[in-house]
Amino acid sequence: MEQIMASTVLPMRFSMLLRTIDPIKFLWSGALFLGVLSIFILITKLPVHILRIFYPPVSVFVHVGLFIVYIVSASYQAGSDKSDPKHLQSGPPWYITKSCSVASNKDNIGYCQQAKALFGFTIIIIVLYFVEIIVSVHSCFVTKEEKAERDELREEKRTMKEYEDMVLRTPRTFPMMSPALPSGGTTQMMPTMSSRSPEFSTFGHGSSDLPLRDHFSTPNPRPPAQQESSETLAPGNQPQMYFPPPPKKAAKV
C-alpha cells in the first residue's frame, strides 16, 4: 500500500515542480549554460588541436552533441509563448516575428532586441556546427594520396631517428653527414673541428700571411716572400734592399 501511494505521490510532486518553473527563466538559464559550455569547448579545442589529438571521430562526437543542444535551444526560443495566461500565443513569439517597435512599453524594446540577437546567434552557431560535422565526417576517410604522404613522413622520421641514434653511439668516428633522403640523395655537411683534429693542433703554429711578423719574430729574420721572389727572378747582381731603407747622406754644397 505504501509503495502504491509513493508511486502516485512522486509523479504529482514532479508535475507540480514543473508547473512552478518559469519557462522564461528556464530558457534564459539554458542559453547562459550554452554560452559557458561553448566558450569552454572553444578554449579546450585550441591546445587539443596543437597537440594533434583531436581526431576526426572525436570531433564528430563533440560537434554532433553541440549541434543537437543548439537545435533544442532554438526550438525553445521559437516555441509558443505561454508565459502570460491572459495572452497565450501559439507559434513563434512576437519578439522574433515582429519588429521591436510594436512593444507597448518602450522599456521592453531593449529586451526584444536582445532576444532577436540571441536567436540569430543560435542559428549561426547551428550552421557552423553543421559545417564542422561535415568536415569531420569527411576527415574520417583517408584518401590514397594522404595515406602515401603520411607513410613518407613516418619513414623520414624513422630514418632521422636511426641516424641520431647512430651518431650518439659513435660520436668520434661517424662523419657529420645528413641521413639519406627518401628520394635517394644525400647532403654533405662541413666536417667539424675539435681539439683532437689536425687542423686544431696546427692552428697558431704555422706561418702567418703577414711578412713583417715572421721577419721580426724569429731568431734569424728572413726577408719577405715578395723580396725573395724578386731577388731570384731578377738577372745580375743587384744591391740588397733593406726594409726600411737606410737614410741617404745629404750632399755638401
UniProtKB/Swiss-Prot annotation:
GO terms for cellular component: membrane. Residues 184-200, 226-240 have a biased composition (Polar residues). Disruption phenotype: Causes the inhibition in mycelium growth and induces conidia formation, corresponding with reduced expression of brlA and abaA. Results in elevated production of kojic acid, via increased expression of kojA, kojR and kojT. Induction: Expression is increased during growth and development. Residues 242-253 have a biased composition (Pro residues). The keyword Electron transport does not apply. It is a multi-pass membrane protein. The chain crosses the membrane at residues 23-43, 53-73, 117-137. Keywords: Membrane, Transmembrane, Transmembrane helix. It is found in: Membrane. Residues 174-253 are annotated as: Disordered. The keyword Membrane applies. Involved in mycelium growth and repression of conidia formation by affecting the expression of brlA and abaA. Acts as a negative regulation factor for kojic acid production through affecting the expression of kojA, kojR and kojT. This is Kojic acid related protein 1. It comes from Aspergillus oryzae (strain ATCC 42149 / RIB 40).
